[in-house]
């Protein structure tokens, strides 16, 4: 009997459908087609989402800056390394030691990352521009601070800005060490600065600074390096979906004018599917005197050396350099 009723209902539905106008038939067909498309897409989405949860154990190794600082890395960048007290310390001392004047100072932040330094400078009343060679970093900066100025640019390209464009230039958080040609960097900064302008650069004692990233310091304001018999060079952090590990390696015998001598290798392991992503940061870590001699050779004058120990960055410094008037 159920089959008979089904056939009877189907015939009834067909008779009703056959008596409708051509327009109604078209609309019924269109609605049916849309339902089919939606059901197909829904199934596809569910399959793709499910497949991402399967164990794939893929391995990726990145050494290029644009590949390292991709959308994923940028999304967790603050969780790994951001420390507001350090940023405030850097900007505060820049203001203190470099004669900054609200609205008249025009600052370039090289290696602006996700934009926090530019935001802080703007909050203090200064004009500021951030540049970075990572498209993902620039996109994130513009998304977070849409009212501020960020550009995808390389500090080693002298044509990026006109001569005498800025009163101040900053280069914080190891940015300078990613550059092989430091002479060109200082030449470009000299060209872009106004006469009497200031350049603030972050330099470290490469043999003693703490390579543990902020996220991996379980003691917060106390560095475990002070109590370790041997320098700690590894960091391990567990996030919700990823395990993070990093290891710093320094080779002092390498000529940094030719090749990198320091490496920070980061490993991200996806807890759910076993995927592994590795980043190898290649750094040209010349000594502080070597770098300062390059700066002096293009005409810079060293004005101040600021110890960052106050913000828990032992053996790290901000140097304030000045272009002659």
List where the protein language model places each region.
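Conserved class I S-adenosyl-L-methionine
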Residues: 37-102, 116
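Class I SAM-dependent methyltransferase "Motif I" SAM/SAH-binding loop
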Residues: 111-113
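Class I SAM-dependent methyltransferase SAM/SAH-binding core
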Residues: 115-158
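A short acidic, Gly/Pro-enriched loop at the edge of an enzyme's catalytic core
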Residues: 160-169
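A short glycine-rich, Lys/Arg-flanked "PGG" loop and its adjoining helix->strand segment in the class I
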Residues: 183-195
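Conserved beta-strand signature within the Rossmann-like core of class I S-adenosyl-L-methionine
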Residues: 196-203
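SAM-dependent methyltransferase
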Residues: 203-292
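C-terminal lobe and adjacent flexible extensions of AdoMet/dcAdoMet transferase-like proteins
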Residues: 282-325
